Swiss-Prot record:
Keywords: FAD, Flavoprotein, Glycoprotein, Membrane, Monooxygenase, Oxidoreductase, Transmembrane, Transmembrane helix
Known EC number: 1.-.-.-
Gene Ontology CC, one term: membrane
Segments crossing the lipid bilayer: 17-37
Any GO MF annotation of the entry: FAD binding
Induction remarks: Expression is significantly up-regulated under xenovulene A producing condition.
Protein name: Salicylate hydroxylase asL1
Use of this protein: Xenovulene A is a natural product exhibiting little structural resemblance with classical benzodiazepines yet is able to displace high-affinity ligand binding to the benzodiazepine site of the gamma-aminobutyrate A (GABAA) receptor and could be potentially used as an anti-depressant with reduced addictive properties.
Localization, UniProt: Membrane
Pathway in which this enzyme or protein is active: Secondary metabolite biosynthesis; terpenoid biosynthesis
Secretion signal span: none
Originating gene: asL1
Length: 480
C-alpha cells in the first residue's frame, strides 16, 4: 500500500452508518452489498465495467449456498428463482443428480447411443441458472445510487486508525470509507494492493486446462442425447478431457462446457479468454464416443476459449490486511471442476455479514463518541482477521481439491480397458470431496465466527496478546 498519510478524525457516531466499499460488482460483490445494506450499513460498490456484466454461462448453487443466501437476505434466493433457476435435484431429498458416464468408449456396438454409467451421487436442492440472468435479478435489490460504474481501482491507502481508507481510481477520483472488501475476482487489484504487484499470490497461475462454453437449444440437445440425458446433469469423462452439461433457463437451453488438457503455456496471462472454435473441441475429443461428438457439433462454430487459472500454486497468505480484505475469487480463485467457487463465495458473504453486524454492535456500545473512530477501526480489523481465520482453510482446500478431481476425470486409464477397474475407484474419493462441500455446517461457521470475533475483542481489551484462534477440535461441528 502507499506511503502513510495523516487524516483528521472523522465522526463515527452510532447515528452515522458504517460505510463499506466493495470493489467488484459481480455476483459475490452484489450479494454482499445486499446483505450489508439490510443491516443499515452504507455500501458503495465500485465496478470497473460500464454496467453489471457477467458471461452467459451456466452455474449451479448447492443447498448449503442457498441456505447462506436465505440467512443473508431471502431476497437473494428469490432473485435466483426469478432468473429461471432449474431444479437439478430434488429440493427435499437426496437425489443422485451428478452423473458420470464414459464419454470415450463404445461398450455396445449394436447401440451407438449407449454410454456406460460410471457413478451417481448428489445432494438435495441444487439449482442451475445463467450467470448473467442471476446478476441481473440481484442488481434490482441493490439500492439506487449504491453502485458506481467505470471505476477502475488504482491504489489503496490504509495508514491510520483515525482516518478513512482511501480508494484512488484511474480516472483521478477518490473515495473515503471505513473499510474495503475486494470482490474483484481472479485478477483482483485489491489483492495486488495487499501483497504488492510482485508477490507470487498477486497473480493467478495457468492450470493447463481450457474450457469451451456454449449453449444448445434443448430441442436440439434432446435429438442427440435423448430426453433423460439432456434433462439431467452429466459429466462425460475420458483421457485428457471431460464434457459437462446441464439444463438452464427453465429447461429451454442446455449449458455445455468442454474441458481440455493443454500442455503448452498460455500465450497471454493478461487475457484469460481468446477466440476458439467448435473444431478445436472436436480435435481435442478425437476418437471419443459419437454421442459426445454429435453434441459438440450442435455448438456454435465460434466459441470462447477460456484459460483456467487459479491461486493453487501461490495462495494468498491471508485474506485481510488492516481494514482491507478480499473475498470470493479475489481471495481463493479456483478452477471450476467442483462447480463450487460461487457457492463458497456466498459462504464468505454470510461470514462477513455476521462480522460486520458485530462491528456495528461494538461501536454502538461505545459511550465515548470521541473514541468511536478508533473503536470502529479496531473492530473492523478484528472482524477481517476473524474472517481470515474462519474461511482460509476451507476455501484453500477447495482450490486444491478442484485440481485433484480434474486429474481424476482426465485419467489416461479411461482409454485402456485393462485399467478401467482402477480408474473407477476414483469415484469414492470424488464423493467424499463433494460431501465436504455440500454438507458444510453453516450454523457451526456462524457460531465460530461470532465466538472468534468476541474472543479477539476480549483478548485485545485484556491486552494479553491472544489472537483468539479456535482450533478445529474446539468446534467439532465445524468442518471443511
Amino acid at each position: 500500500m502507499d506511503s502513510p498519510e495523516v487524516y483528521e478524525v472523522v465522526d463515527a457516531s452510532p447515528e452515522k452508518p458504517m460505510e463499506i466499499a466493495i470493489v467488484g460488482g459481480g455476483i459475490v460483490g452484489v450479494i454482499l452489498a445486499i446483505g450489508l445494506t439490510r443491516q443499515n450499513i452504507k455500501v458503495r460498490v465500485f465496478e470497473q465495467a460500464a454496467s453489471f456484466r457477467e458471461i452467459g454461462a451456466g452455474m449451479a448453487f448447492n443447498a448449503c449456498a442457498r441456505n447462506c443466501m436465505d440467512l443473508i437476505d431471502p431476497v437473494i434466493t428469490q432473485a435466483l428463482l426469478r432468473c429461471g433457476a432449474v431444479n437439478m435435484s430434488d429440493v427435499d431429498a437426496e437425489d443422485d443428480y451428478l452423473r458420470w458416464i464414459d464419454g470415450y468408449n463404445q461398450h455396445r456396438p449394436e447401440d451407438p447411443s449407449y454410454q456406460r454409467p460410471l457413478s451417481e451421487i448428489g445432494g438435495a436442492g441444487f439449482r442451475g441458472c445463467r450467470r448473467d440472468q442471476f446478476l441481473e435479478e440481484l442488481a434490482k435489490e441493490v439500492p439506487q445510487g449504491a453502485v458506481e460504474f467505470r471505476k477502475r481501482l488504482a491504489s489503496l491507502e490504509d495508514n491510520t486508525d483515525n482516518g478513512p481508507v482511501v480508494l484512488n481510481f484511474t480516472d483521478g477520483t477518490r473515495a473515503e470509507v471505513d473499510a474495503v472488501i475486494g470482490c474483484d475476482g481472479i485478477k483482483s487489484v485489491v489483492r495486488k494492493q495487499m501483497f504488492g504487484t510482485n508477490h507470487p499470490a498477486s497473480n493467478a497461475q495457468y492450470t493447463h486446462k481450457v474450457a469451451y462454453r456454449g449453449l444448445v437449444p434443448m430441442n436440439r440437445a434432446v435429438e442427440v442425447l435423448g430426453p433423460w440425458k439432456a434433462g439431467n446433469f452429466h459429466h462425460h469423462v475420458g483421457p485428457g478431457a471431460h464434457l459437462t452439461h446441464y439444463p438452464v433457463a427453465n429447461n429451454t437451453v442446455l449449458n455445455v462446457v468442454a474441458f481440455l488438457s493443454d500442455p503448452n503455456p498460455w500465450p497471454d496471462n493478461q487475457r484469460m479468454e481468446m477466440e476458439g472454435s467448435r473444431e478445436d473441441v472436436l480435435t481435442g475429443l478425437k476418437g471419443w464416443h459419437p454421442t459426445v461428438l454429435n453434441l459438440v457439433n450442435l455448438l456454435p462454430e465460434k466459441l470462447s476459449k477460456w484459460a483456467l487459472f487459479d491461486l493453487c500454486e501461490f495462495p494468498a497468505p491471508s485474506y485481510s490486511a488492516g481494514r482491507v480484505c478480499i473475498a470470493g475469487d479475489a481471495a481463493h480463485a479456483s478452477s471450476p471442476h467442483h462447480g463450487a467457487s460461487a457457492c463458497l463465495g456466498v459462504e464468505d458473504c454470510l461470514c462477513l455479514n455476521v462480522l460486520l453486524a458485530q462491528v456495528r454492535e461494538t461501536v454502538a456500545a461505545n459511550q465515548d463518541p470521541a473514541k468511536n473512530r478508533l473503536a470502529l477501526s479496531r473492530a473492523i480489523e478484528t472482524a477481517f482477521k476473524t474472517f481470515d481465520t474462519v474461511r482460509h482453510k476451507r476455501t484453500q482446500w477447495l482450490v486444491n481439491s478442484s485440481r485433484r478431481v480434474c486429474d481424476l476425470y482426465h485419467q489416461p486409464e479411461w482409454a485402456d480397458p485393462t485399467r478401467w477397474a482402477k480408474a473407477e475407484t476414483c469415484f469414492e474419493e470424488i464423493r467424499d470431496r463433494s460431501y465436504k462441500i455440500w454438507y458444510f455446517d453453516v450454523d457451526g461457521m456462524v457460531k465460530q465466527t461470532r465466538d472468534e470475533y468476541e474472543l479477539r475483542q476480549h483478548g485485545e481489551k485484556l491486552g494479553n496478546g491472544t489472537n483468539g484462534v479456535f482450533s478445529d477440535e474446539r468446534h467439532g461441528g465445524y468442518t471443511l
